[in-house]
Curated annotation (Swiss-Prot):
It catalyses: a fatty acyl-[ACP] + phosphate = an acyl phosphate + holo-[ACP]. GO terms for biological process: fatty acid biosynthetic process; phospholipid biosynthetic process. Pfam families: FA_synthesis. This is Phosphate acyltransferase. InterPro entries: FA_synthesis (IPR003664), Phospholipid_synth_PlsX-like (IPR012281). SUPFAM superfamilies: Isocitrate/Isopropylmalate dehydrogenase-like. It comes from Sinorhizobium medicae (strain WSM419). Catalyzes the reversible formation of acyl-phosphate (acyl-PO(4)) from acyl-[acyl-carrier-protein] (acyl-ACP). This enzyme utilizes acyl-ACP as fatty acyl donor, but not acyl-CoA. Keywords: Cytoplasm, Lipid biosynthesis, Lipid metabolism, Phospholipid biosynthesis, Phospholipid metabolism, Transferase. Belongs to the PlsX family. NCBIfam families: plsX. One of its GO terms (cellular component) is cytoplasm. Pathway: Lipid metabolism; phospholipid metabolism. Transmembrane segments: none annotated.
């Protein structure tokens, strides 16, 4: 059984998306038990439309829903202990849930998660990891927005956590890890990135295979399983990729409807275009993972539909089933244990 708490009021559409999304996820994973946090007046009628979900859930009424435009500090002051977002996160502390999923305000969700769950021992700052479609399948990119201007040690931590996530998600023994840089040569890039590369290489971490520096086009190629960067460049890369996917989809749609011949050609090529659309569907890779906390937090896109939210639940389910938290803790313990041993004076 996997216990998943949901911030039912989070996102642009709240329970109108979260509840049917949870119902879809339950169809795929019948061993889920949901703990729902929301405003009863908005949720009761929607839940009644999904009797299987209702039977597999417990519902907690909450006074407050965090707004999508609220500042993190305001959301903390107003919603601590009372909002659906806070209570969904706190369900992990109360041992009622193994993972929390929310489509709410990213800044507020991160602030509440850090305040409520705290960071793991040895982790200075958390990271947001995104699952990224590539020519070879999927890769993980982190950080995509949590820590702007991460230093070398924080990038080292991200490499450890990203490697653990890749082992949990892709089931590879030693995932390849690359540092995003402006070139692959050792002399290029900011000092923090070059120092992080040295730290990762010298640490010789058991759970990852350090590839070296990678460039922006390596992300989509799937050159490595994990791409490590700081939050500013990672977020720009993510938004640029999402925008490019929409742009290509619009180009194809316009091209296929321009002339009668193009429309006829589309009929014959429809299956190929359907496969392309499936590959580029952002709903299939919805669900950013907050790494470095004493609990698993999944962030869905705020504008996700029911299928997109269900995909975010799928990510949380997989992370619990494959022991993400334990893998990160074990890797951190090995790394920091080795560092402590090296620091001891020689007899």
């Amino acid at each position: 059984m996997v216990r998943i708490s949901l911030d039912v009021m989070g996102g642009d559409y709240g329970p109108e998306v979260v509840i049917p999304g949870a119902a879809r996820a339950l169809e795929r994973h019948p061993d889920i038990k949901f703990v729902l946090f929301g405003q009863e007046a908005r949720c009761t009628e929607l839940l009644a439309k999904h009797p299987k979900l209702q039977a597999s859930s417990t519902f907690h009424d909450c006074e407050i829903a965090v707004g999508m435009d609220e500042k993190p500090s305001q959301a903390l002051r107003r919603g601590r202990g009372k909002s659906s977002m806070w209570k969904a996160i706190d369900a992990i502390n109360a041992h009622e849930a193994d993972v929390v999923v929310s489509a709410g305000n990213t800044g507020a969700l991160m602030a509440m998660s850090v305040f409520c769950l705290r960071t793991m021992q040895g982790i200075q700052r958390p990271a947001i990891a995104a699952i990224w479609p590539t020519l070879k399948g999927e890769s993980i990119v982190l950080d995509v927005g949590a820590t702007i201007g991460a230093d070398a040690q924080q990038l080292m931590d991200f490499a450890l956590m990203g490697g653990a996530m890749a082992r949990a998600l892709f089931e590879v023994e030693r995932p390849s890890v690359g540092l995003l840089n402006v070139g692959v040569e050792e002399i290029k890039g900011q000092e923090e990135v070059k120092e992080a590369g040295r730290l990762i290489r010298e640490a010789d971490i058991e759970g990852i295979e350090y590839y070296g520096f990678v460039e922006g086009d390596d992300i989509g190629r799937g050159t490595v399983d994990v791409v490590v960067t700081e939050g500013f460049s990672g977020n720009i890369a993510l938004k640029a990729a999402e925008g490019t996917a929409r742009q290509i989809a619009e180009y194809l749609r316009a091209a296929m409807s321009r002339t009668l011949l193009a429309k006829i050609g589309y009929i014959f090529a429809k299956s190929a275009f359907d496969r392309l659309r499936e590959k580029m569907d952002p709903r299939k890779v919805n669900g950013g993972v907050f790494l470095g906390l004493n609990g698993i937090v999944i962030k869905s896109h705020g504008g996700a539909d029911a299928e997109g939210f269900a995909a975010a639940i799928d990510v949380g389910y997989d992370m619990v089933k494959n022991g993400l938290k334990a893998k990160i803790e074990a890797d951190l313990a090995r790394y920091h244990g080795a560092q402590a041993s090296e620091a001891l004076p020689r007899a």
